A protein has these predicted regions:
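PLP-dependent amino-acid enzyme catalytic core
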Residues: 1-198
Length: 198
């Protein structure tokens, strides 16, 4: 089954939606294509002509691809609040005084044990928004500090990951202009995780 053939059964990942996400990310001044690494020995071992792996360690200087989903979800949320399509909002527009006047400022909440939270913090900072990141018991101080460097308020809680998700969601619900940006879905919370996947 080719990607082209699979697209009709993947409406959440349509070509149009993928192109919107790509255009959005390309609008960031920090954007650059990440390299492909050719793995000749793996290709030979698997009996393939070629085998490539996308090296996302260069993505926005964060050493992970996770920033792509969180930032795109945040942009979609802002676009929806402004009754616009995300394709109308480039990085320059999202960081403009006009947008700040029309939208104001949100606080994006998430739970993480690493890269997703760092990506949300980075994107919120770049877009002039706030972020709060809860980390589960056992998270390293180094990961916490890396997220704090991106401008987030970060705490390591004395609970597991799932409980951190519940706590972050409750905090978002109780905070004026609070928004949960989580990379897991549950009943009644599917829109933002869908944007993250796109």
């Amino acid at each position: 089954l080719s990607l082209h053939d699979a697209l009709p059964i993947l409406p959440l990942m349509s070509k149009e939606k993928i192109e919107k996400a790509l255009a959005f990310h390309k609008s960031f001044p920090q954007y650059s294509e990440t390299p492909l690494a050719e793995l000749n020995h793996m290709a030979a071992y698997l009996g393939l002509n070629d085998f490539f792996v996308k090296d996302e360690s260069y993505r926005f200087g964060l050493n992970a691809f996770k920033v792509l989903g969180g930032s795109f979800a945040m942009a979609n949320y802002i676009a929806e609040k402004l009754k616009k399509d995300v394709s109308e909002l480039t990085y320059d527009e999202l960081t403009s005084d006009q947008l700040r006047s029309a939208f104001g400022q949100a606080t994006f909440f998430t739970a993480t044990d690493g890269n997703h939270g760092r990506g949300v913090a980075w994107a919120a900072n770049k877009l002039g928004q706030k972020s709060v990141v809860l980390m589960p018991k056992g998270s390293t101080q180094t990961r916490k500090e890396n997220i704090e460097k991106e401008g987030a308020t970060v705490t390591i809680e004395e609970v597991n990951y799932d409980e951190c998700v519940r706590m972050a969601n409750k905090m978002a619900e109780e905070t004026e202009n609070g928004v949960m940006v989580q990379d897991t879905a549950w009943d009644g919370y599917e829109k933002i995780p869908t944007w993250i996947m796109q």
